[in-house]
């Protein structure tokens, strides 16, 4: 699923009676994600939410048709960089968005932002480097800095009297950030830590044996997508679900739950967006997504939806004239749109200042596996790296 996906732009043009020639006057957005391989479900969730955002906008921003160009990074940093180059140099997009993986985003950042005319609106990955020393005037995030979500979980565990914790995550940029995040706020004893091979390792039996021997009050993990599915299954198979409570970030969600099923019931996670947040924009987004796709959206999708709405807010404010990049950046920084998370504001490093919530894995009234909000862990949370950013 690579190259131009003309469906969105073409449908928008036809719906409003616009000739194909007007494609030159479109707002053109490149979207880099993983659309093949074992993690393709995440990319599909993001794509669905982008398409829904375009539908909610009536196919236009500031009177111009929206054109989305999807590219598959194949779960590889070098491929992600190549696809980003194509979007900027060949497709001449106004914006590039997407990026699930921190290593893919880090490989692609300069390729997109150093051109000067292209804005990168990251919809998921939030590596610490980009929040700090590598912050960039042409980069905006609609997600979070990697450390923040586990920091929220650490704060929550302190309130619940969890006295000892075992940490596990993959050995790459995001995994290191996630475990650093929970270490930053958790005040109990960390009695073990394992970084597993990424992305090849899907067998966690050796590490789980170490967890069983350590007998912590809980285990904290970060294993997104297919890795989270395997971890939860093996945690239960090892019998640890009866003795070691599981606390997680990005490991149990709308994408993984159809495969994890009841094995994940009762587990707790942290996130900046949950599908039951009560604001009107979120209610519409979740209801329309479920109606269209027969499943719940995930935070990957919610952040992608917000990325399109953020871009639309700036385009509308500038009446479709995206030529003045200083004005464009100023409008993006206002974050003047109805976010599905209920609103946020940008810090100086262009990462959101926002709330983080604790969610429990449950069954809904129809028996579908989902998550529900049980607590607000952090209000107006800032990341830990913004002071290292040269932007003020």
Region roles according to the model:
Residues 7-17:
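Bacterial N-terminal signal peptides
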Residues 18-23:
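Sec/Tat signal peptide C-region and signal peptidase I cleavage site
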Residues 27, 333-392:
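Solvent-exposed, acidic/polar segments of extracytosolic/periplasmic ligand-binding ectodomains
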Residues 30-49, 71-78, 100, 168-176, ...:
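Extracytoplasmic "Venus flytrap"
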Residues 41-48, 56, 60-130, 142, ...:
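Beta-alpha junction/loop-to-helix N-cap segments that form part of ligand/metal-binding clefts
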Residues 82, 128-131, 136-238, 275-284:
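Extracellular/periplasmic Venus flytrap/periplasmic-binding protein
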Residues 87-100, 119-123, 164-169, 215-225, ...:
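Periplasmic-binding protein-like
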Residues 234-305, 316-322, 365, 371-392:
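Extracellular/periplasmic periplasmic-binding protein-like sensory domains
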């Amino acid at each position: 699923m690579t190259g131009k996906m003309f469906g969105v732009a073409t449908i928008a043009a036809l719906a409003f009676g616009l000739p194909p020639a007007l494609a030159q006057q479109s707002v053109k957005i490149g979207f880099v994600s993983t659309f093949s391989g074992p993690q393709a479900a995440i990319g599909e969730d993001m794509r669905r939410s982008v398409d829904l955002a375009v539908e909610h906008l009536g196919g236009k921003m500031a009177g111009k048709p929206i054109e989305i160009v999807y590219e598959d990074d194949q779960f590889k940093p070098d491929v992600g960089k190549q696809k980003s180059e194509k979007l900027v140099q060949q497709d001449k997009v106004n914006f590039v968005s997407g990026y699930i993986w921190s290593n893919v985003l880090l490989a692609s950042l300069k390729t997109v932002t150093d051109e000067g005319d292209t804005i990168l609106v990251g919809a998921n990955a939030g590596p610490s480097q980009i929040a700090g020393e590598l912050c960039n005037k042409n980069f905006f995030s609609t997600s979070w800095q990697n450390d923040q979500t586990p920091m929220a979980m650490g704060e929550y565990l302190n309130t619940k009297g969890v006295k000892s914790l075992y940490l596990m995550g993959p050995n790459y940029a995001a995994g290191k950030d996630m475990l650093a995040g929970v270490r930053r706020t958790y005040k109990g004893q960390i009695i073990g830590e394992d970084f597993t091979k990424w992305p090849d390792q899907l067998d966690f039996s050796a590490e789980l044996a170490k967890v069983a021997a350590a007998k912590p009050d809980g285990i904290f993990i970060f294993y997104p997508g297919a890795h989270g599915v395997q971890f939860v299954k093996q945690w239960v198979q090892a019998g640890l679900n009866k003795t070691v409570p599981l606390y997680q970030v990005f490991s149990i969600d709308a994408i993984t739950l159809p495969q994890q099923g009841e094995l994940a019931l009762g587990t707790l996670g942290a996130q900046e967006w949950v599908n039951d947040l009560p604001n009107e924009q979120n209610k519409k987004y979740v209801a329309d997504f479920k109606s269209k796709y027969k499943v719940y959206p995930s935070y990957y999708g919610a952040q992608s939806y917000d990325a399109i709405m953020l871009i639309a807010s700036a385009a509308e404010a500038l009446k479709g004239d995206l030529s003045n990049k200083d004005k464009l950046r100023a409008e993006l920084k206002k974050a003047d749109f109805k976010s599905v998370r209920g609103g946020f504001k940008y810090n100086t490093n262009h990462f959101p200042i926002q709330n983080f919530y604790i969610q429990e894995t449950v069954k809904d009234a129809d028996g579908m596996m989902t998550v529900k909000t049980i607590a607000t862990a952090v209000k107006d949370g800032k990341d830990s790296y913004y002071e290292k950013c040269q932007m003020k």
